[in-house]
Amino acid sequence: MTNYVAIDIGGTNIKYGLIDQDGQLVESHEVATEAHKGGPHILQKTKDIVASYLEKGPVAGVAISSAGMVDPDKGEIFYAGPQIPNYAGTQFKKEIEESFQVPCEIENDVNCAGLAEAVSGSGKGAGITLCLTIGTGIGGCLIIDGQIFHGFSNSACEVGYMHMQDGAFQDLASTTALVEYVAKAHGEEVGHWNGRRIFKEATEGNKLCMEGIDRMVDYLGKGLANICYVANPEVVILGGGIMGQEAILKPKIRKALKNTLVPSLAEKTRLEFAHHQNTAGMLGAYYHFKTKQS
């Protein structure tokens, strides 16, 4: 049976596993990224994962999803934030192919998550899919007819940096922004709060927590509306850990979009939450690999 190694490199953890020729995840594992140790360390960890699978038998390829800005044609990272030192310039495709003589492809993690949703998740069958991941920051991707829209310099849909009246989109509508707002409202340290606690206390009647959620949703709705006016997606898919609170967030976000978009656009723009959770990066990396290698 033909198998592919799929690796999803995040700032906290590296998820990896085997995907078979039918696109099914056969097994999956997780290891700490140790991002503070930098790009060379992450590259070596990736090589160790590939080597461990090759010891058990042949693989048809290595599909990688990674944080940072990725040039999928060169197969390398061309920009990464300070959270992962010396990551920019890491040549995954070249290093993996030269070390193991197997084909390798790499793509940005949010693009991979969006591709997974467009191919086999909440966006299946849609012509234009906008996918946003809400977490520490906000990442975005646009999938058009099953293809990732990269833009001229592989920087399309970096919506977290989008300027809004009160600051950058991700500084207003991310999980980080929510936690910081609620902590400040309570006069407490940020470390005392997280998304899970905020939603729990909001449902128990904590007005400051609900106020923080409503504030985040308001900014999220405005940012989403701006993107929808430009891209006119058929479906908007929201992912990230905090979107697990779908029962609370979905009606609020739907209302925010309805209040911000013109009626004709609001009626025709479908809002969904991500179907694939922890496996999205690996599945999307596999779909990207198959497209690049076809």
Language-model region placement:
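A charged helix-plus-loop insertion that forms the helical arch/lid used to bind
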Residues: E76-G89
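Hydrophobic "anchor" residues
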Residues: L25, I77, I148-F149
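A short acidic/small-residue loop/turn micro-motif
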Residues: T33-E34, P85, A156-E158
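ATP-binding/phosphotransfer module of carbohydrate and carboxylate kinases, centering on a glycine-rich
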Residues: M1-G61, D71-K74, E98-C104, A116-I128, ...
